[in-house]
Swiss-Prot record:
HAMAP family recorded: IHF_alpha
A GO BP annotation: regulation of translation
GO cellular component entries: cytosol
Cross-referenced CDD domains: IHF_A
Assembly and binders: Heterodimer of an alpha and a beta chain.
Gene: ihfA
Gene3D superfamilies linked: IHF-like DNA-binding proteins (4.10.520.10)
Pfam families per record: Bac_DNA_binding
Family as reported in the entry's similarity comment: Belongs to the bacterial histone-like protein family.
Keyword annotations: DNA recombination, DNA-binding, Transcription, Transcription regulation, Translation regulation
Name of the protein in question: Integration host factor subunit alpha
Entry's Gene Ontology molecular function annotations: DNA binding; structural constituent of chromatin
Length: 102
């Protein structure tokens, strides 16, 4: 199961005491700022969580799996995420059943 924007809004409402409208605006604003930064070619660094970065992939040859015909796959930019060491350690500790140390 994945954590959704609606669930993030509910968590802000429950844990911080914001009303639902304010919580939704904060979540939307956060996502919009991340989108804008990435669209402008900037990375997004969230301390203790990870980095969102852009990677340029060059054009490369591909193949249509149905016909076997060679077709070019166009150059594009993709968003990558690299988890911080802190996040990786917390996930691994949880997987092993160890207590979570922040």
């Amino acid at each position: 199961m994945a954590l959704t924007k609606a669930e993030l809004t509910d968590l802000l409402f429950e844990n911080i005491g914001l009303n639902k409208r304010e919580a939704k605006e904060i979540v939307e604003c956060f996502y919009e700022e991340m989108r804008t930064a990435l669209q402008n070619g900037d990375g997004v660094k969230l301390s203790g969580f990870g980095n969102f970065q852009l990677r340029t992939k060059p054009q490369r040859p591909g193949r249509n799996p149905k016909t076997g015909e060679e077709i070019p796959i166009s150059a594009r930019r993709v968003v990558t995420f690299h988890a911080s060491q802190k996040l990786k350690s917390m996930v691994e500790a949880n997987y092993r059943g160890e207590p979570n140390v922040n």
